Amino acid sequence: MSQQHTLPVTLPPTLSQELLKNVSPPADIQQEQRKQPTPLPAPCQKVLSELPVAVPSKHEEKHATPVKGLLEQECGQLQQQEPQEQEVHLAKHQELQELQEQELHLGKQPEPQEQELHLGKQQQQQESQEQELYLGKQPEPQDQELHLGKQQAPQEQELHLGKQPEPQEQELHLGKQPEPQDQELYLGKRLEPQEQELHLGKQQQQQESQEQELDLGKQPEPQDQELHLGKQQAPQEQELHLGKQPEPQEQELHLVKQQEPQDQELHLGKRLEPQEQELHLGKQQQPQEQKLHPGEAAAAGVTGAGPAASKAARRATGAGTAPGKAAAAAGATGAGTAATAPATAEERQKAESLEQQLEQEKAQREEQLKEQLEEKKRILDQQLDQEVAKRYEQLGVKKEQLLQPLGQQEGQLEKPVFVPAPGQVQDIQPPQPPKGEVLLPAEQQQEPEV
């Protein structure tokens, strides 16, 4: 209607006052409306601006009545819709703020049960790390970071994407925490304290057994030591039985000789057995030689015995110095020396003969080895010569095969081929007979054909 009629329309003062009055909003919106006054809707402003202020006439009032009714209806509808929309918008905004505050409050302050579970996890992780460090195993930090990253991932995704879950979903998300049994299974099936103690006990036992084996490997067993001492004491007892008593000076020299090889063996960290020591010295003395030479026999037999052997020797010498045994020894010395003199000469001869035999055997072996090496060298030289000759023959054959086609090509190149020019006449030469034949004239050659 307003578009069809171009006549000026004026509103009465009562209607203009009602339009200018502010609609009373709720208490929450009043503060915002005080700061920002609510403007009138756009169609109402346009109508007011377009309407001129003039004194209406009777004819104009008749035509303006339908237009006034339409404008009043439109402005009333707009004014009713605006506060409703504002209220709905504010209610939604308040709900969103409340949800955000609840989420932040729940995210910052977990319940006491959740805190206790979180502390329990940390304590278990610390205990497991300490146990692994004690056992020589260090957990990788990447696994821990991944485990923590998996827990933080959903919360960070929700905050980053702006997704705000409802309070019920948050409570369910926070309330879902694994029980201690599930935690133990997730952390790699941690051993119970009893099993851990057993595992540590086994490791300690293994270490102790290894240390004992090392100690035993360096030091001979007590049984071996006793046998070794028994072997050393036997010649001394034989000497006492024969009545020979070494002088104190010889004993001191004997002890000095014993201590020197012991120091050397300790410095090297290896103790040779009595047989190895005898081989190292290059002398193997029989028990009869030990009877005749008590000082040398004791030095050769007791080199690896240590302080225990020296103590036994001292005891034996102390026992031999008793007054009752001294007389018996003095009486038996004459008979013993006379009987052992020929035995020593025979033994020396045997030892010398053995040494000579060993030297001869060594020389024979060396000669045999030299002969074998020379024969092998000869055989290898012959084989090399044969191979070289074969290769030379093969090369000669190949050269001949290659040179034959080259000779044929050279012969063909030596015979020139003359091509006559277009203005020249080629001289036809008769064929020359081979050596020893004479050519007849052409007439005589044609006669036999006729």
Curated annotation (Swiss-Prot):
Biased composition (Low complexity): 120-135, 295-344
PTM comment: Substrate of transglutaminase. Specific glutamines or lysines are cross-linked to keratins, desmoplakin and to inter involucrin molecules.
Alphabetized Pfam families for the sequence: Involucrin2, Involucrin_N
Entries under InterPro entries matching the protein: Involucrin2, Involucrin_CS, Involucrin_N
Protein localization: Cytoplasm
GO-annotated biological processes: keratinization
Bias-annotated ranges (Basic and acidic residues): 86-108, 187-200, 264-281, 345-370
Tissue distribution: Keratinocytes of epidermis and other stratified squamous epithelia.
Keywords assigned by UniProt, alphabetized: Cytoplasm, Keratinization, Repeat
The keyword Calcium belongs to this UniProt entry's keyword annotation: no
Biased composition (Polar residues): 1-19
Keyword Cytoplasm: yes
Function (record text): Part of the insoluble cornified cell envelope (CE) of stratified squamous epithelia.
Quaternary structure (record): Directly or indirectly cross-linked to cornifelin (CNFN).
Family per record: Belongs to the involucrin family.
Record protein name field: Involucrin
The gene coding this protein: IVL
